[in-house]
Amino acid sequence: MKILNSPKEAINYTKSLNGSIGFVPTMGALHEGHLSLIEKARKENDYVIVSIFVNPTQFLPGEDLDKYPRRLEADFEICKRAGVDAVFTPTPENMYSNDEVLIKAPKIKGYILEGFNRPGHFDGVLQVVNKLFNIIRPTRAYFGKKDAQQLYLIKQMVNNFFFDIEIVECETKREKDGLALSSRNIYLSEEERKRALSISKALKRAAKLSSKTKNIEEIEKEMLEILDVDELQYIAFVDRDFNHIDEIKPGNTIILLAAKVGSTRLIDNIWI
């Protein structure tokens, strides 16, 4: 397995390959969710490249940039065992210049929900993903459905910038008890983790109710009765194009939820 430390190294490496490239961009602290993306990429491509980069431009002031879990050697071992061909580990210094050409998230759909609660977050996400796509030039790139709004915006960017890349949507990976896997779960105390389960339980209940009623107010009311969080930031009902909807549309509805349990911010969703 090759370790690529700079954009130039990565560009030269990918130019030398003859075959399809599956790309899994990550911020490290790899877990089973990341592994499921890597495994899917491994099955569908001749080569698999994983990037590990804690991207500073997608963190807001006061967020967890400094304490975000970093365990590079353990991540390398996970990648090696999973059959990854190369890991790209750039630094902020070789990814960004002092005079950046900035990419901005769409004015409406980039600034609702996650974009409203974390203003500027998606500017940073799209900026770095655009750079990574230009460096790696993958055939396919793999993203989890847990970050549904991010997934939607990346697909829009791919269309807008005419990238010849297939974006592969991957199901959210969960613990046996239903908690959506996240690198930030390590921040949760035992008591907080138990309460965090109320998020997936509320979403599961919403999905079950949606087969009986299309009434969003009724579904949201039941979700609120289940939730046991310290700060509910939003419950939202949207279609696959992130337009707000007035009633459940079977096959074209995503229910999204963001909340803090203790000081840890968690997001989850369910596609109906």
From Swiss-Prot:
Where does the UniProt annotation locate this protein? Cytoplasm
Binding of beta-alanine, residues: Q58
For this entry, the protein name equals Pantothenate synthetase
- Comment field (misc): The reaction proceeds by a bi uni uni bi ping pong mechanism.
Species of provenance: Nautilia profundicola (strain ATCC BAA-1463 / DSM 18972 / AmH)
Gene3D superfamilies referenced in this protein's UniProt entry, alphabetically:
HUPs (3.40.50.620), Pantoate-beta-alanine ligase, C-terminal domain (3.30.1300.10)
Q: In which pathway does it act?
A: Cofactor biosynthesis; (R)-pantothenate biosynthesis; (R)-pantothenate from (R)-pantoate and beta-alanine: step 1/1
Instruction: Give the enzyme's main class according to its UniProt record, as a single word.
Output: ligase
Catalytic activity entry: (R)-pantoate + beta-alanine + ATP = (R)-pantothenate + AMP + diphosphate + H(+)
Keyword hit for Cytoplasm: yes
Q: Which gene encodes it?
A: panC
Active site, renumbered: H34 (proton donor)
Tell me which EC number(s) this protein carries: 6.3.2.1
